[in-house]
């Protein structure tokens, strides 16, 4: 009995000693499971944006998810992920990986998602993905792939989505996807593919979405896709497709959306192009080179509920009438920006409005509506009643003569009314723009506006001041006095060399004074014997002429005085010159 008690006590002591050791071992293994600089959430390890050049070796063996995104990994070595046999998803995108060993993914058979996008991979060996047969999602987009091996995806029977977007692929091998029987999404967009073989999609019986946009296809034959019996969405936008044909009589009942926008489609090869897709619901034909669509093509669009036709070069003639009538009866979604590209007079006008306003569909094929000029309205003379005895047979109608109906007048009034509204709106907007400019300049530069106002006020004040000065000053008056001396004064002047001369005052701003000269100069001088003195000066009166001797010793003194209304004039004595001669 005592021995048993001692043995129990010793066993409990051993357990107490072993328990801390086990705990320390578990803690150390947990610490070893999360590498330095990484973030661990349960069994998920995130080593992102760490500039890693090698994959950490201290990752726990029970890791279910590993993210090594945004690092500097350059290659994947042999058995790179050995020991991580529980791994279900692996993210290696946005690295510098250019070389992958054929056996790099050995030991991770449970992997379901592998992301290798945005690297520098230029090729894969055929057996690269053989160890990961349980893959559901494989992303190889945004790399530098030039070609694919014929057995590149062999064995990937559970693959659901395959992304090969934005590479440099030119061709796709025949039957390369034959083992991908469960594939639902295939993205081959943004490559350089020019053509596809007829059996390239063999075995893809569950594919629902196919991306072939931004490639270099020039022709499209719907007979390439008879094996895609489950395809619902086909994207072929922004290629160089000019012709769409159908060389096989079959019904593609699964297709619901077809995107052909951004191509160079001018016409369809025949009315049976869309007859093989009776359940088509969405059709994109915008940004092509279509000028019209025939009635047979329109009749095959029996299930459409969404269509886009903008960005084409629609010719607004009678050929457009079938499309306009179809659009009017279409009850689904459509764009309203279907614009005429020709003729020149209708460029920029909505197709439906052009047909409605210009009666394009109401005219014969030989008659053209002249839109460059407005035709004058015809005037009709009232018919005078004929006498009953003058009954003449009716003249046959002239060929081509038509009487304008009431629709023409209504259309003209409608057009003129629109022009009036457009002109009024333009005038109103221009006035608003002017007012806005004035307001902004007043707010932005208040000092300059004040200076302009002050300058305008100064100009007004100066103008008013000039007008007041003109009213205050008297009008300029000039008098010409014809001075004729008497006989006694003439004889005295001849003998003595002197003679009296009278200066009269008058209201003017200028004055004239007589010139001093001798007798011979006086008799021979034919110009007025006057000169001009300073302005506003009053002259001395009764100043005589002097001889040459007296001129040397004598100076003419004039007493001046400022006066605004002074002018003195001297007469001319040309009559005496004539008498003496």
UniProtKB/Swiss-Prot annotation:
Transmembrane segments annotated in the record for this chain: 420-440
Domain LRRCT residues, every copy: 312-363
Topology, Extracellular side: 31-419
SMART domains named in the record: LRR_SD22 (SM00365), LRR_TYP (SM00369), LRRNT (SM00013)
Subcellular location: Cell membrane; Postsynaptic cell membrane
Primary site of residence: membrane
Membrane topology: Single-pass type I membrane protein
GO biological process, one term: positive regulation of synapse assembly
Tissue expression per record: Expressed in neuronal tissues.
Segments in the Cytoplasmic topological domain: 441-581
Annotated GO CC locations: extracellular matrix; extracellular space; glutamatergic synapse; postsynaptic density membrane
Pfam families the record matches: LRR_1, LRR_8
Region (Disordered): 377-408
PROSITE patterns for the chain: LRR
Domain LRRNT: 31-61
Signal sequence residues: 1-30
InterPro entries assigned: Leu-rich_rpt, Leu-rich_rpt_typical-subtyp, LRR_dom_sf, LRR_TM_domain-containing, LRRNT
LRR repeat start and end residues: 63-83, 86-107, 110-131, 134-155, 158-179, 182-203, 206-226, 230-251, 254-275, 279-300
Keyword Protein biosynthesis carried by entry: no
Function: Exhibits a limited synaptogenic activity in vitro, restricted to excitatory presynaptic differentiation. May play a role in the development and maintenance of the vertebrate nervous system.
PANTHER family for this protein: ANTIGEN BSP, PUTATIVE-RELATED, LEUCINE RICH REPEAT TRANSMEMBRANE NEURONAL 3
UniProt similarity note: Belongs to the LRRTM family.
The name this protein goes by in its record: Leucine-rich repeat transmembrane neuronal protein 3
Organism annotation: Homo sapiens (Human)
